[in-house]
Amino acid sequence: MCRASAPANLLKTYERVYPFGWLGVLADVPPVSHELIYANTERGFALCSMRSATRSRYYVQVPTTDKVENWTIDQFWTELGNRLDPEARANLVTGPALEMSIAPLRSFVAEPMRFGRMFLAGDAAHIVPPTGAKGLNLAASDVGYLWTAPVSYTHLRA
């Protein structure tokens, strides 16, 4: 909403749409590891992420032409296992999907992030692919910086 209010002659945007997406599965299964696993293989990228001790999120890179309805959960687990190293593959526990979706990947940045008293933050300012859930971290960081500026200014004037 704020970005649409920015003066068009001052706002510059940069976007990159990637030629692949991530087929993601959220499942009530213990994680492969307590650490993030990024696997870059000839078959494509894979990501293993722990949500809790009993819930995990996994991704495999797929062409943008793939449709989630063309994937079964068994096909997903097989493909994920094929992209993991032997140790991670041995720790992979499979199960039904709570959620299964394909996320198209893109990066986006708007500049400047300030227009007078209006500041762009979060997705209004920048979007990153969902590696390790950094998007929400960036939004929180933006707000953290925005919060400290007026507080610092007020303390300097006191």
Where are these regions (language model features)?
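Conserved FAD-binding catalytic core of PHBH/FMO-like flavoproteins
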Residues: 1-105, 110
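Conserved mid-domain beta->alpha element of the FAD-binding
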Residues: 2, 101-157
